[in-house]
Amino acid sequence: MSKDCTIQDVFHRFYPSFESTHSISPAQRKAAYHIMNCKTGAFGVNVSVCEDCGCMSVHYNSCRDRCCPMCQEFPKEKWVDARREDILDAPYFHVVFTVPEELNPIIYSNQKFLYTALYHAASDTLSELAADNKYLGTDISYICILHTWGSTMNFHPHIHAIVLGGGLDVKNHWKDNGKDFFLPIKVISKTFRGKYMAELKQLWENDRLEFHGSAAPYKNYYTFKELLNTCYAKEWIPYCKKPFDGAESVIRYLGKYTHRIAISNYRIKDMTESTVTFSAKDYKNQGLWKEITISGEEFIRRFLMHVPPKRFVRIRHYDLLSSRNKKKKITLCRNILGCKKYISKLKDMDAPAIIRLLYNKDICKCSSCGGKIIPLPTEQHFIKPKPHMLC
């Protein structure tokens, strides 16, 4: 029994047997290798020496994989800080787009196409409805983030959209709907359903879909048609969460959710020779936390379901935040609303300065005497220092 275990420990214990008995994609295999070898020396080391006392320190490089639980904090802080320049001190709304669970096998079997279709359907829904004079009649600003997991690491693909509560009309005048979201949820639901199903049907008609694993039955024409009819008939349930209270609330949310992975180390509670216990929210019981125990191989299977396709972009910016509009349009919105400009704190800082600012830790100071630490030349990195010389 191991109480203080990490996801890396779980992979070391259970991944080899899982790999030998399961089909694994190249992206999943790469992520597993990175997680198991992060900060072990497999990705190189940096050796530094104190100018004053000669004490040496060895730093093992991280894997920098976006699925690794040990590698998210630093890129997250830099990304969120850069977004400060894009966020206005104005109301924002949080819209979540979900799909019927009947589609999950097809989506998992065609991740690149059908994740992309989620972005297309969500963004087209928001942009087209916002541009309609019946609702707002403007170009708006929003960020879409794909998550593929539920609290138990089940497969649950959905889009989080952070939507500015107003926009610019054709004359570049600002329009908003006060504190209320400017789009009816029922209209969003029907529009999103129509757009997603239309793209799914088009991919099917163009013979672009694959049917693996639990999606295999849908190779049959009539079974697939029945699935389409079932999903068309269902009421899709996107929902709008409580609005954000200004720019800082948006930034805090982005910091919490943008670089999330399926599960983090603090939720791992126990590991035995054959099982893993982790905490999860029970949404059938008012979102209270509970502990779940599953086999080690099942834990690996669930975790790897959420490794995105190679080079797949999970965070996307639209309309006023698109690269061709952002510099001019966001500045115009800021001037109209009288918002102060948020300046990036980390933009021109090097890594030691960022670590010093965020974590109050000076990695250029010797932990023994406080002297200045300097890096050793690369060719000396693999000269193992004697134990008494280590800080």
Task: Please tell me what each predicted stretch does.
Residues 1-391:
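Beta->alpha loop/short-helix hinge microenvironment recognizer with preference
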